[in-house]
C-alpha cells in the first residue's frame, strides 16, 4: 500500500474509545419481503416471496457524546440503519443495544432514549397548530398538564418557533416544519438525536439556519449524542465529529473527522476513496 493510500485506509466499523458504548449494532442484517405482483399470486401462489437485504452483517459502536454523520448513496441502507438504532425497525438477524438494552426485548425502554427526527412532512397533523401537534405528541411521551405546557413553550423558544405556535402546520414552510420536528423530539429529552437528511428539502439559507439550530441544541448538553444521515460533506464537517460510510447494505468505513483534518483529507475525499475501494473489492 502506498503512502497516499494509507491516508485513506478504510477501517470497517471502527470502534473509537474503550468505554462501554451507548449504542452497539452487532452483526445486524435487515431483510424486507418484496411484495408479489398479481400475476405471481395467481401463477405461483405457494411460492415464497423474494426478500431484499437492506443491511448485511453491520457492526457499529457509538459512544456517549459522539456526533456521527452517516453517508452513502441512495438505497445504501442509511435510513434502515438509523431506524434500527431508533427501534422503529427490528433486525432480522443480530441485535441492537441502546444503553445495554436490546431494541428487540426492551423496545419501549430503548425508544424512550432515542429521538428520531423524520424528514417527512406528513408526520404532522396539518389542520392543527404547531403547539397542538406538540401537545399531542408530548402526551404520547406521558407528559401532561402544566409540565407539558411548560415543556412546549421551552422547546418552541429553543427552535425559534414561539411566534408561529398558533399557526396551522399546513401554512408552515419546509424549514419551519423541520424546526417543529426537532421541537417534537426535544420534548421527551432523549439521550440520542437521529436526523434523516434534515436539510434535503431546504433552500441554502434555511439549510444554514437549521445547521446552526442543531449545533446550538446539541452543544447545550455536550453529552448528547447525534447521528445524522446526509449527502452533504460540508454538513457532515459542520455537525459531526465522525463519519460512517454505508454502501450496498454494508458499513464500509468509519473515521474521526479530526483524524482526516490532521492528514489534510476532506470528508468528500474520504467518502470517495471508501466508495472506490468498495467497487474494487
Q: Where are these predicted regions, by residue range?
A:
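Conserved ABC ATPase "signature" region
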Residues: 135, 139, 146-164
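Helix-to-loop junction immediately C-terminal to a conserved catalytic motif
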Residues: 86
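The feature captures the beta-strand-to-loop junction immediately N-terminal to the Walker
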Residues: 71-73
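Conserved ABC transporter NBD signature motif
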Residues: 94-104, 110
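Catalytic Walker B motif of ABC-type/P-loop ATPase nucleotide-binding domains
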Residues: 193-197
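Helical segment within the ABC ATPase nucleotide-binding domain
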Residues: 208-221
Amino acid at each position: 500500500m502506498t503512502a497516499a493510500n494509507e491516508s485513506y485506509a478504510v477501517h470497517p466499523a471502527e470502534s473509537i474509545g474503550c468505554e462501554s458504548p451507548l449504542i452497539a449494532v452487532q452483526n445486524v442484517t435487515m431483510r424486507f419481503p418484496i411484495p408479489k405482483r398479481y400475476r405471481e399470486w395467481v401463477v405461483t401462489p405457494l411460492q415464497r416471496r423474494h426478500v431484499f437485504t437492506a443491511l448485511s452483517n453491520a457492526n457499529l459502536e457509538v459512544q456517549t457524546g459522539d456526533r456521527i454523520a452517516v453517508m452513502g448513496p441512495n438505497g445504501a441502507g442509511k435510513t434502515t440503519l438509523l431506524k434500527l438504532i431508533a427501534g422503529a425497525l427490528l433486525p432480522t438477524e443480530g441485535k441492537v443495544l441502546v444503553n445495554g438494552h436490546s431494541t428487540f426485548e426492551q423496545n419501549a425502554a430503548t425508544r424512550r432514549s432515542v429521538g428520531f427526527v423524520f424528514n417527512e412532512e406528513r408526520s404532522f397533523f396539518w389542520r392543527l397548530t404547531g403547539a397542538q401537534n406538540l401537545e399531542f405528541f408530548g402526551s404520547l411521551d406521558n407528559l401532561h398538564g402544566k409540565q407539558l405546557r411548560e415543556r412546549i413553550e421551552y422547546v418552541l423558544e429553543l427552535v425559534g418557533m414561539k411566534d408561529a405556535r398558533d399557526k396551522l402546520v399546513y401554512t408552515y414552510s419546509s424549514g419551519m416544519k423541520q424546526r417543529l420536528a426537532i421541537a417534537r423530539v426535544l420534548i421527551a429529552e432523549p439521550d440520542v438525536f437521529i436526523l434523516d437528511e434534515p436539510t434535503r428539502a431546504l433552500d441554502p439559507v434555511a439549510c444554514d439556519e437549521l445547521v446552526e439550530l442543531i449545533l446550538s441544541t446539541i452543544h447545550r448538553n455536550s453529552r448528547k449524542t447525534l447521528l445524522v444521515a446526509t449527502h452533504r460533506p460540508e454538513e457532515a464537517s459542520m455537525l459531526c465529529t465522525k463519519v460512517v460510510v454505508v454502501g450496498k447494505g454494508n458499513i464500509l468505513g468509519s473515521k474521526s473527522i479530526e483524524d482526516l483534518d490532521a492528514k489534510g483529507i476532506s470528508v468528500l475525499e474520504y467518502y470517495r476513496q471508501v466508495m472506490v475501494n468498495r467497487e474494487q473489492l
